[in-house]
Amino acid sequence: MSESTWAVPDSRKLTFDDADEPVTKLQVRVVNGTVNVVGTEESSARLEVSSVEGPPLIVTRDGATLTIGYEDLPWRGFLKWLDPQGWNRSAVVSLAVPAGADVEVGMVGAGAVVSGIRGRTEVRGVSGDTTLVKLAGPVRAESVTGNLEAQAVTGELRFKSVSGDLTVIEGAGGRVAAESVSGDMLLDLDPTARATDIRLTTVSGEVAIRLPHPADARVEANTASGAVSNAFEDLRISGNWGTKKITGTLGAGNGTLRATTVSGSIALLRRPADEEPPFEDAPGENPPAGDAASGGPAPEGASSPADDQSGSAGSTKKVL
C-alpha cells in the first residue's frame, strides 16, 4: 500500500478498513489534550479527533503503520518540547485498533489511556498521567512528572520517571521493573498471578507492596533512612539505626522481590486469601469517588480507573 496522508484541522472521524493489510503499528504524538487507545478484535482501525487547537494533526497511513501527530514533533527526541512556545496546541484523539498491534504514544502535557492491547506498548510523557488497562504485551513507560497507573496488566512492565508515581492494581505480569528519583511506588499483586520478578528503585519515594497470602518470593527490601513495616512472619527485619532491611523467603521462593529506597519508607502488606477485590474498603469507610476507565475510545477525554487505595490485613511489624 502506498503512503496516504491527511491534515486534520478540526473534529473528524476516519476509518482504515483494509483486510489485506490491517494496522499492526500505531504511533501517536500530541501536545496537551487526551489520547485514548483501545484494542479490538476487528481488522479495521478507527480514529476520532474530537477537538484540535493550534496546527492541524497529520495522519499518515504507510502500509501497516498508522501515525497521528505533528510534522514538527518527532517520536525520537520529543522530550525537547519543553519550550513553552510548543505548548500552544491541543488535541483530543481516540483510536480503536486491532488488539495485536504495537502501540507507541508520546505526549507533552497530555493524558493517555491505553486498554486491551496484546502487542507491545510504549508510552513516553513529560507531565501527563497515563492509565494502562488489561495489556497483555510488554509495556515500557517513561515520564518526567506524570504518574502511571496500570490495572490488570499481564505483560512485562518497565517504568522510569523523575517524580512520577507508579500504581499497579491487580498486577499479574511476570516482571515489574521501576526506577524513580522521588516518585512513590504502590503495587497490589493479583493472587492468581504466576511467580513475579519485582525490582523497584527510588531515591526518596515511598514503596508499598501488597502480596497475596500465601506468597511465593525471595524478598530483599532495604532503606537507608526510612521506616520499614512487614506483615509476613517468615520475613525478618534487621537494622535499628541507619539501613534497615526486610529479608527472607515466602513459600517456595520462586519469585523475586527487590525494593530499594534511600530516604523513603518500605511497607510489605498482606492480602488475605479470601479477599476478592484489591484495595477493598475497611468496614465503615466510604469508597472513593471516581469512574472506571472507559473500555473504548470516547469523543472527549476518557476517565481513568477509580482512584486506588491500599490496605493490609493481619499483624504488621514496623521499625522506625
Feature locations, PLM:
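Intrinsically disordered, low-complexity terminal regions
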Residues: 1-143, 147-320
